[in-house]
Curated annotation (Swiss-Prot):
The keyword tRNA processing applies. It is found in: Cytoplasm. Belongs to the DsrF/TusC family. The keyword Cytoplasm applies. One of its GO terms (biological process) is tRNA wobble position uridine thiolation. This is Protein TusC. Gene3D superfamilies: DsrEFH-like.
Length: 119
């Protein structure tokens, strides 16, 4: 089976991309164990706890990221440069444990995947 990477690059709640990406990720995990999750650019905001999506009449799907471990999704990466650009600390308690990688290392890791789905 092909290796599949899910890349979250959009902020949560502005569009349905994050929610749809998470749904696709969980569904795909039933078919293969060979997948990983990458958080880049504004996608790093998907990792923040304590969001208030009800204020913009959006569904709170962020807590569902906590289920990744139950679905045996253990390869989670976050772009260290994206965190810095947005004033976030890699030591922040994110909703899912994601390993920070610098941009070059993240690109090398992403190159190991056959299919890349971006949300």
């Amino acid at each position: 089976m092909k290796r599949i990477a899910f890349v979250f690059s959009t902020a949560p709640h502005g569009t349905a991309a994050g929610r749809e990406g998470l749904d696709a990720l969980l569904a795909t995990s039933a078919l293969t164990d060979d997948l990983a999750v990458f958080f880049i650019a504004d996608g790093v905001f998907q990792l923040l706890p304590g969001q208030k999506p009800d204020a913009v009449l959006a569904r709170d799907y962020i807590a569902t990221f906590k289920l990744l471990g139950l679905y045996d999704i253990e390869q989670c990466w976050v772009c260290a440069a994206s965190l810095r650009e947005r004033g976030l600390d890699p030591q922040t308690p994110f909703v899912v444990e994601a390993t920070p990688l610098e941009a070059d290392a993240l690109r090398r890791e992403l190159a190991n995947y056959d299919v890349i789905l971006r949300f």
